[in-house]
Amino acid sequence: MAACVDHDVHVHTYLSDCCADKEHHRPAAILALAREMGVRTIGFSDHVWMNPAIEPSGWYRKQDATQITRLREDLSAIRTPVRVLVGCEADMRAPGQFGITRDFAATLDYTLLSCSHFHMRDFVEQPAADTPGDLARHLLSFFTSGVASGVATSIAHPFLPCGHMAQYDAIVAAISDAAFADAFGAAAANRVAIEVTCAFLPPDDGPRTWSIETPARMLSLAKRAGCRFTFGSDAHCAEHQRKLPLLGR
């Protein structure tokens, strides 16, 4: 049976430096498209770094609390039947090193925490070696730290090895069911949800370097461990946002 995907709580706007369409991907357009698609709740999740104890990267330095201030200013002029949540996508530099504080997280409706931005090679701690086993251990270390952090509502694109997608199948296969059970059990115990993301879907164009069975196995084990789930398109443009219904199939 298809799932009912009535919310999208991972949407970036023009405020995120990685936005693919800064001219058009603005809150009013995002909410209009959500209404057209029948999506009842939109959560805005621009990148933010708000932890003065940890120096941000150059990319993150200009993405601070002003992101939230500007977003709220934009939203104040919009009238929509779509429920609006103001959140962010926060990051980790290493286990125990988070891009936001608990105090900052408390000012938002929710927070997504990324535990796998390994493509930021000059900023995020890297695995011992570029092998499936080492990457698997690195993902587990980041994830278990993230779910215990006290700053995460949901884990963004969990166990998605950014920068190493050619090895995605092999990396996840290197994580045993028992290891996943422990990791997801910790998430459930800490009431941290798991994101079901469009990033799990193999690309429509170009070579398919991973099987849909890889994220399907992981999500099945998360469900067995008692985890809650959030849906997210991880949209950086309208084209990405339109892919959300694919998660219900």
Describe each model-derived feature in a short phrase.
Residues Y14-S16, Y110-A225, A235:
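Domain-core and long-helix interface of multi-subunit machines
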Residues F98-I100, D182, R217-M218, L246:
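A short acidic, amphipathic alpha-helical/loop segment
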Residues V82-A128:
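Hydrophobic alpha-helical segments and helix pairs
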Residues P203, P245-L246:
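Generic secondary-structure boundary signal with a strong preference for alpha-helix termini
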Residues R26, Q97, W210-T214, K243:
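Residues at alpha-helix caps and immediate loop-helix transition turns in enzyme cores, especially N-
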Residues M37-T41, T107, G150-S154:
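Short loop/turn motifs at secondary-structure junctions
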Residues M1-A94, D103, H164-A174, A183, ...:
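An N-terminally biased module of ancient metal coordination in phosphate/nucleic-acid-related enzymes
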